Design a protein with these regions (language model features):
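Positively charged n-region of N-terminal signal peptides that target proteins for export
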Residues: 1-4
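A generic structural signal for short, non-catalytic loop/turn and secondary-structure boundary residues
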Residues: 9, 47-50, 55, 74, ...
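Bacterial signal peptide processing site
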Residues: 20-22
Length: 248
């Protein structure tokens, strides 16, 4: 998985609240509806006040970083990370959802022509927003951005040591990349990964909570790491002009 300081979009979010002894986030006062997974006995999906479906990402341990030496030096060394369970939006935040935020709060206007040129409908992902724009939206919906570790863990979907977030090679039937469409695609156009997260590869960049530290992988704590050492925020994933190796 690559990380960049190139900025384009709004990201998936996680609810802000405490956790129980199992690391599961308490969300009763922050959602409209809870769907119980009968096997796990835990809320597998939740529906937030902004209408976003959120999937439960189980706690676990994974190897974070570039296993194939195809990315940036800052993606080394590969190291073991342990994360608590959390919920993540199943889709990228849409133009319609962000428009609702602006209308409700009077937040500063954006360059809508530039946005609609590549994301033309309310069901397309929101683009051309800064990290501060995403943080303002997150505060409004009582969520937060995922850390880089949370994002990578969720994006991998439980596929340890694989090149892509899907089984097999990347293909135009699985993701919007390499300008094969010419603009963003509506959220949910392609199949999800095994954690039920859509468009986790391709389509648009996604912001992370961390600040950028090129040496952080060498000093990262094992449990729930977050980099806070610099002024640049992290963006995971890229836009539709990504080459296949960027979608790792």
């Amino acid at each position: 998985m690559n990380r960049y300081i190139y900025l384009l979009l709004i990201c998936v979010f996680l609810p802000i609240s405490g956790c129980d002894d199992y690391g599961i986030i308490h969300i009763v006062d922050q959602v409209d509806e809870v769907v119980i997974d009968q096997t796990l006995g835990l809320p597998k999906t939740i529906i937030g006040r902004n209408g976003s479906m959120m999937a439960l990402i189980p706690n676990g341990i994974f190897e974070m970083g570039d296993h194939f030496a195809e990315g940036e030096q800052s993606e080394q060394p590969v190291h073991e990370v342990e994360l608590d369970a959390f919920y993540m939006d199943m889709h990228e935040i849409t133009v319609g959802q962000y428009r609702g935020f602006i209308e409700a709060t009077g937040y500063q206007s954006l360059n809508w022509k530039k946005i609609l040129d590549v994301s033309p409908t309310d069901n397309h992902p929101m683009v051309h927003v800064s990290w501060f724009d995403t943080m303002s939206y997150a505060k409004w919906v009582k969520k937060r951005l995922p850390t880089e570790a949370e994002w990578e863990y969720a994006a991998r979907g439980g596929l340890a040591g694989k090149r892509y977030a899907y089984v097999g090679n990347i293909h135009p039937s699985k993701a919007n990349y390499n300008r094969n469409i010419g603009q963003t695609t509506a959220v949910g156009t392609y199949p999800p990964n095994s954690y039920e997260l859509y468009d986790i590869a391709g389509n648009v960049w996604e912001w992370c909570l961390d600040t950028y530290d090129p040496n952080f992988y060498s000093i990262s704590p094992r449990k729930n790491p977050i980099a806070e050492a610099n002024v640049f925020q992290l963006a995971e994933d890229f836009s539709d002009d990504n080459k296949p190796h960027i979608l790792r």
